[in-house]
Amino acid sequence: MHRRTFIKTSIAAALAATLASKLGAQEMDAESQASFDTVMAFMGAMGGGDMDTMSRLMADDMVWHNEGDKTLPWIHGDIKGKAAIFEFLPVFSSNLQTTKWENGDAFASGDTVAVFGTMAATATKTGQSTGDFTFALRAKVRDGQVVLWHWFEDSFVVSQAYHGKM
């Protein structure tokens, strides 16, 4: 699968703008603002399928962490390194299509950014929808690049949809 087509979701560049406007009312120090901007740019690039920008914003030693049902082909715990992450993303997007993405809150403190919201997805294997579920993200930034993408979600409902048990 071509890298540019790996992620076809509703997480478009507007995601970054939405979060930025929510956080705009808060005062941030320069490091926090830079970290926030980096994570929002990364999310926007991911949602828009802009692999060049994603690659530029990823540290070579970036870790993507996602726990859950190990029978799901994209759940591996820690995925380490840019190359491994680019191999993982097409597996994820070919199995789960995001159908809804709403951000609730986001904040940044130093090198850490947290994002909280609600999403829904459809498992391509079964066609079953997860319905709405919550997510949280903890990301870390170093020297203008994302070094940690720690994803939290309702992995039970995702597993149920994937295995046709909804």
Language model feature labels by segment:
Residues H2-R56, D60, M166:
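Short, low-complexity N-terminal intrinsically disordered segments enriched in polar/charged residues
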Residues F6, T71-P73, V158:
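A generic signature of intrinsically disordered, low-complexity regions enriched in glycine/proline
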Residues K8-L19, G24-Q26, A30, F86-M166:
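A beta-strand edge to alpha-helix "cap/lid" segment located at domain peripheries
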Residues A34, T53, D60-D105, G110:
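A solvent-exposed, acidic/Ser-Thr-rich amphipathic alpha-helical stretch
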Residues M40-G49, L72-H76, F92-L96, F116-T118:
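Short, mixed-charge, low-aromatic patches
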Residues G49-D52, W74, T134-L137:
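Short, charged low-complexity linear motifs
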